[in-house]
A protein has these predicted regions:
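Glycine-rich, acidic/polar active-site loops that bind/position phosphate-bearing ligands
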Residues: 106-319
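Active-site core of metal-dependent hydrolases
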Residues: 1-105
């Protein structure tokens, strides 16, 4: 963005990201045009507002950049209005009982504090725009809005305490998070023979293992070569999307592993975790594996957790 935007527009965008200032529509138009040009250069044909409804999974609607110009042809177009707000059908998403289905209207709104990215697939590329999802009256219909509101409330309360402690040079305080994702890898042919794994992501019946941690694939043990190939491919995809993968290793149970990215602001870390889990499953399939993210896929051996290393971080770098 710094290379593509006028200096005044870029500074205005940074004030919105860092300080929460309202975004002027002229700035939004310039940002949207720069994002469109960058995305098209990278092969993208569509854009999507990515949000996290109460289903517990990601959601997205792909829209083309092409727009008819009335002369029998089309142009690539992406305005600030389209960047800031989208309107998916809210009737098919859970609301927690906030409203009846026939009144369900939903809006996505761009979250400028989380970087946009381009998702490449065998069938093309899409500009993905992290967003919130809300009702027309502003009620949160997703899991990102409560996180952003919690961060804002924490910042406001902490500022008062820091001022009393003499830390007046601190302008903002944010939460940071480094999540450790544990997972199991099993051969795809074994997963395909188990309807419970395919449907529930875990085993519902079976015999206890003969041994657990007594094999050589124990905690911090040598990583099997086939798994190492998967990990290298997977982490390469993470780096391409700006996800700072830091550590990977064998976990306690046989066939269990862990990936731990470097800590980031909690909002970005949360977005990156959703993306990480999606990439983990698709990359595992490309290597003949089936990835299990269920917290307890097998009885009698350790389950998979996601430790959150959480802290409060000031704009001056103090924990």
């Amino acid at each position: 963005m710094k290379e593509r935007l006028p200096k005044s527009v870029y500074k205005s965008l940074i004030r919105t990201i860092d300080g929460g200032e309202p975004l002027d529509m002229s700035v939004a138009d310039a940002v949207a045009n720069a994002m469109k040009d960058w995305a098209i250069e990278k092969g993208a044909t569509h854009y999507a507002h990515v949000f996290y409804p109460l289903t517990g999974a990601t959601a997205e609607k792909h829209d083309s950049f092409l727009s008819p110009n009335g002369g029998g042809s089309a142009i690539a177009e992406f305005s600030g209005e389209l960047l800031i707000q989208g309107e998916p059908d809210g009737s098919s998403f859970p609301t927690g009982g906030l409203r009846p289905t026939f009144e369900a209207r939903g809006y996505t709104a761009w979250d400028p504090t989380s970087p946009a990215y381009i998702m490449h697939t065998p069938n093309g590329a899409v500009l993905m725009i992290p967003s919130v999802f809300m009702s027309w009256t502003g009620e949160a219909l997703d899991k990102k809005i409560p996180l952003l509101r919690s961060n804002a409330a924490m910042n406001a309360a902490a500022q008062k305490v820091l001022t009393l402690m003499g830390e007046e040079e601190i302008a903002t305080l944010n939460s940071s998070c480094g999540a450790e994702q544990e997972y199991f890898l099993i051969d795809e042919k074994f997963a395909n023979a188990r309807p419970d794994i395919l449907l529930a992501g875990r085993t519902l019946f079976g015999a206890s293992p003969a041994k657990g941690q007594q094999f050589d694939d124990h905690y911090f043990g040598a990583i099997p070569e086939r798994v190492q190939v998967f990990m290298q491919d997977f982490e390469d995809k993470l780096y391409r999307l700006g996800i700072p993968a830091k550590t990977h290793h064998n976990e306690v149970a046989p066939g269990q592993f862990e990936i731990a990215p470097y800590f980031e602001s909690a909002n970005i870390a949360s977005d990156h975790q959703q993306l990480l889990m999606t990439l983990m499953k698709t990359t595992a399939k490309q290597h003949g594996f089936f990835c299990l993210l269920h917290e307890k896929p097998f009885a009698g051996v350790n389950g998979s957790g996601k430790h959150n290393n959480w802290s409060m971080l000031t704009n001056t770098g103090k924990n």
